[in-house]
Amino acid sequence: MSSLLNFYRKVLNVPLSLLVKSRAIPTDPVKELNLNLEQPIIYVLPYTSQTDLLILQKNCLSLNLPDPLQNNELNGQSLPRYVFLDEGRRFFKSKGAKSETESIFYRYLDLHRNNESLDVQLIPASVLWGRSPGKESEPHLRLMSSFQRIISMIWFGRDNFVRFSQALSLKYMVAEHGADEGIAQKLARVAKIHFAKQRYSAMGPRLPDRQAMFNKIIQSPAIKVAIEEEAKTKKISIEKARQEAEKIVNEIAADVSHESLRIADRVLSWLWNKLYQGINVQNGDRVRKLALEGHEIVYVPCHRSHMDYLLLSYLLYHQGLVPPHIAAGINLNFFPAGPIFRSWGAFFIRRTFKGNRLYSTIFREYLAELFYRGYSVEYFIEGGRSRTGRLLEPKTGMMSMTLQALQRGLTRPISIVPVYIGYEHVLEVDTYAKELRGAEKEKENAGLVLRVIKKLKNLGQCYVNFAEPIQVNNYLNQHFPEWKESQAEDSRPKWLNEAVDSVAHQVMININKAAAINAKNLIGSVLLASRQRALAREQLIEQVDSYLQLFKNVSYSDDAIVPNDNAEEMLNHVLTLPRSGVISEKDSFGEMIRLDRESAVLMTYYRNNIQHLFVLPSLVASIILHHESVSKDLIIKTVNRIYPFLKAELFLHFEENDVRNQVEAILTEFSAQRIVKYESDVLQINCVRVRALQLHAAGVREILQRYYISLSILLEHPEISRAALEKESRSIAQRLSILHGINAPEFFDKALFSTFSASLKAQGYFDSEGNCILEKAKEAEEILRSLISVEVQLTIQGAMEKVEEVENTETVVKTAEAVTEKNE
């Protein structure tokens, strides 16, 4: 290597060290890309740039990867550890693929002929300067001159990413395709195509001319018809209806600015460092793979907080992906937040537009246009933020529009990426508790934002897990093959409603499969399982350890995140969190850990984030606890009867025929932990560890009580309507929560009783005329009664009698009033 080039690199390193701060994608390539550091590595860069090469070198050294400027010494040959695919702008020439690169590829391939132990890993690596794709009217620029590179160094030095791609095994290439010069040329061509796809996945399509996009939408046939209908219905001119349509488009549409996104990146980096001790991201490689394969990506996260919007876009940006266009509630379109969010990719949607055909048509066309142009999209399928910490029933309007866009002939495949977002502290949790107690929801405004900002300090850890994607084209081909049949544009296909519900439900299941257990939600779950919300420190540690072993040995799913910390470390972490509500107290017997009274209600929010993970073990524990000695077959039979209700309520992923294996694994684990005695297919309480069994069983206690309330009412009044059943169940649940100190606000949530009554219907507890099938309901009621304390049973029966007395009194009063009115 020439001394002149070495000198040039040393000089160039000076401004680079001062001006450039780059970030690696992924952050741990050795682990995430499964690199074998025992085997040689060769880096492939898209075109000649000493600047990019030096930035790559700096990142490789910091990530414990081999230095690209050092050669690989193989079989007596010294071969470069990097290659450039293109000449770049050396001496104002751009010759295309370099013959020397193909020659180096060939020499590496040739080494594999007689060396079976050799496996050179070819890693595509590119350096991104800024992330703006430019405007549609601008020419495509690929290579930069020296002057442009200097300007980029100054302007984009802090917006610099080094992207490592999945390694290609040259041993595999030789085994499959041989090692001639043609294969070397093919490698270079494939690498070029890869870099083009990678650039598109990181920068996305070019930004549209906003007015031209508006005009295209307004001129679409569907909107022209809607404008004419609006004019006719409201008896206004076509021009006035068109102006109204333009106002609606302007109200909805995003106005993305990459300069605004760059500023947001700086601000949010500061904010996250101030707020969180760490942001844990899992499975980002799934999304990067889909983007490289050219999929239209739709992100569908659960909705815990307003922070979700900002957090997901920020993380996608740092995963080397394009921040999506985000469907945001119109309530967030207030000054100054509205214009800022719009520049970050938010497009606004009204809470309801039922009956407003012009608005619904425009919104559907705008969403279809985003898909057509290749922009990724994000929306919250729950419709609003969960106030209880559980997933809400999906609102399917946006999902319906997504499937309709595909059905209309979208050329790119659509992949829906469910996303689990979890926090150790949700900023709005106090507000949620007030709203659940009946307070009015406070309208979002600048003052509210300022009050929230005052709370911004240590909020613990944050978790984002990209769940298993749903490749919609494949899903529809498998479950709804008729979807490809042509339909008139304004007609609604017969398959659509069922397909929308099916995909939406699968999204919720996949989100729950990707749940993250953290210190706060696990410690909180254990304390809430104790009736006094308090445990001795040793007992708490023992129970948390029991849960950790259970989650690791009998995993809910491969995507669920189980912490690596031990119980002691998790408890110490929670005790340091401000406003956690977990208090340590000492007396003459030792240390006690308890929840303060006010925080008990708030902690149910965090428990509910992961309740679905332990509800099946809790049910198994409850059956053993109440029977004391019970056969395995009876446990499985009981679980099978109750499981469909749990599955519907908590979006569990086990199919009915998988439940037996899961229950057997739970029993084996309980036995291994000596929580129960397991001999000859009979389970018995182990008196030494009965407290651990009680705490496990408590996780499902309140759910079973709710089911028992509804079935008791149904048996007492078989002719009752579903609406009346839900209303009466809720009234009794409210009374039970007061008398037995049940702090969970969702205990009398009308949505849960509605879900249960729908499950009863789906499971065949009603005949075709809507009448209760008494024998089946009685069997289920007896099973539930065996799992509920006598004290709770008596309270429920007493409440039912009170309700009946009130109803009888009301009937007498109404009859008397009718007689009086008749006599008058």
From Swiss-Prot:
GO terms for biological process: CDP-diacylglycerol biosynthetic process; fatty acid metabolic process. It is found in: Cell inner membrane. SUPFAM superfamilies: Glycerol-3-phosphate (1)-acyltransferase. The keyword Membrane applies. Keywords: Acyltransferase, Cell inner membrane, Cell membrane, Lipid biosynthesis, Lipid metabolism, Membrane, Phospholipid biosynthesis, Phospholipid metabolism, Transferase. It catalyses: sn-glycerol 3-phosphate + an acyl-CoA = a 1-acyl-sn-glycero-3-phosphate + CoA. Its EC number is 2.3.1.15. InterPro entries: GPAT/DHAPAT, GPAT/DHAPAT_C, GPAT/DHAPAT_LPLAT, GPAT_PlsB, Plipid/glycerol_acylTrfase. CDD domains: LPLAT_DHAPAT-like. NCBIfam families: plsB, PRK04974.1. Belongs to the GPAT/DAPAT family. This is Glycerol-3-phosphate acyltransferase. It comes from Actinobacillus pleuropneumoniae serotype 5b (strain L20). The gene is plsB.
